[in-house]
């Protein structure tokens, strides 16, 4: 598994980098970059894509650490990467004045440092998973199993990319570049709390999978309930910050008064249904953990493609730019309801 995971990450990382670098400007245009923002997006993405293999290897190794019952090491790698990214951002942007390129370099370097530490861990021959000869040749059965388990989160990320493309294009169409900037602020704040829930889900995966396989259903339900409580607490905290501290959140990103005002509205609207979306994320992850891939995929698609995409197309025709904003919390609430209904149906 270790060898096949490394090989797949190398192949996919290199392949995606080559394809994206060859067609970078059209891809950025497709994602909603305007004449004013294209040059900055290009500068940033060239560096990110050149270091894409590092990112693939880092995330792959972290997943393997969790699977090998090393959650503390995986958590350390994640926290180390975030902290180093912040430090290097300040150094490269504020001190060296490298601008957007400095931010990209900081991202790749922080992941590279964590990756070197991960490699050191997997070189220990006393560990269950460790490097050795002959494990890197791809095996069809292993690859099929890896891809089957990973298809749900993969589709979630693909859907998220499609939605971001559509949101950006709708925001440019109905509100201009300022609205795109406001969404960037709101999305940046929202992702802080979403990433915490991702962490809860990642910690839940090996525990839920083991107990389901061992038919210890009481422990399975317990870990599910604890994960829902933790995710909900995280998202309620995010909601409180969005509702009452949105000015300070927007102020961290810009000093432009007009953008701050629009950013405040964007933060409050985008995060309005956060108290219920943590539940939806955990339920989706739960079905992935117990091998119910089709249900997990359906719940992944329901929030983004099946609900949000039609709303983004329809509501702006009624409410103009407000329709773009309101489509997001409506989609979040609807997806949480669907997840609840599916969970009740499955339990019965």
Regions found by a protein language model. Give the residues of each.
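Transmembrane helix-bundle signature of multi-pass secondary active exporters and lipid flippases
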Residues: 48-55, 144-211, 231-239, 256, ...
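Small-residue-rich hydrophobic transmembrane alpha-helices
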Residues: 1-18, 55-74, 182-246, 277-296
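A hydrophobic transmembrane-helix motif
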Residues: 162, 303-307
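Alpha-helical transmembrane segments of multipass membrane proteins
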Residues: 18, 26, 60-64, 83-91, ...
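Short alpha-helical transmembrane segments in multi-pass integral membrane proteins
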Residues: 1-51, 95-150, 208-273, 314-348
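ATP/adenylate-binding site constellation spanning eukaryotic-like Ser/Thr protein kinases
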Residues: 24, 80, 148, 164, ...
